[in-house]
Swiss-Prot record:
Pfam families attached to this UniProt entry: Ribosomal_S6 (PF01250)
GO MF annotations in UniProt: small ribosomal subunit rRNA binding; structural constituent of ribosome
InterPro entries referenced in this protein's UniProt entry, alphabetically: Ribosomal_bS6, Ribosomal_bS6_sf, Ribosomal_S6_plastid/chlpt, Transl_elong_EF1B/ribsomal_bS6
Keywords from the named record: Ribonucleoprotein, Ribosomal protein, RNA-binding, rRNA-binding
Name of the encoding gene: rpsF
GO cellular component: cytoplasm; ribonucleoprotein complex; ribosome
Stated name of the protein: Small ribosomal subunit protein bS6
Family classification: Belongs to the bacterial ribosomal protein bS6 family.
Taxonomic source organism: Chlorobaculum parvum (strain DSM 263 / NCIMB 8327)
Length: 131
């Protein structure tokens, strides 16, 4: 058995579809990944966004980002299914390298230490808010 490696996939689904069709396409994406013996770690559904250029006749796409562990041999089959699915406009699967994973850990560590800009903002007092 091949050792599992970490991958991330960004998918653009036709944004002109109804919500239930987009949900069905997302389920197909997840099912395709898990059917190959892969384990999904994280799914981030960004939602509908205007694309920089037309793909086919679509100007709006539904963006999703999936992180998963898979055997290298499974990637070709996942790509084959995505390529022939008409509702998937574009996709990109990349293998996460060690330097990228180390950088992500450092960014997470420092963002936890420093906090977000919203955490550092001073709350408005009632007197300043009314002025």
């Amino acid at each position: 058995m091949n050792k599992l490696k970490q991958y991330e996939c960004t998918v653009i689904i036709d944004g002109g579809l109804q919500d239930d069709a987009i949900a069905a396409a997302m389920e197909l994406v997840k099912k395709t990944i898990t059917d190959q013996g892969s384990v999904i770690n994280n799914v981030l559904e960004v939602g509908r966004r205007k694309m920089a250029y037309l793909i086919g006749k679509s100007s709006v796409g539904y963006y999703a980002h999936i992180e998963f562990d898979a055997a290298p041999s499974a990637i070709a089959e996942i790509e084959r299914v995505f390529r022939y699915e008409e509702n998937i406009l574009r996709f990109l699967i990349i293998q996460l390298s060690s330097p990228l994973l180390e950088m992500r850990k450092r960014v997470e560590k420092y963002s936890v230490m420093l906090g977000s800009p919203e955490d550092q903002a001073e709350p408005e007092s009632e007197s300043t808010a009314k002025s």
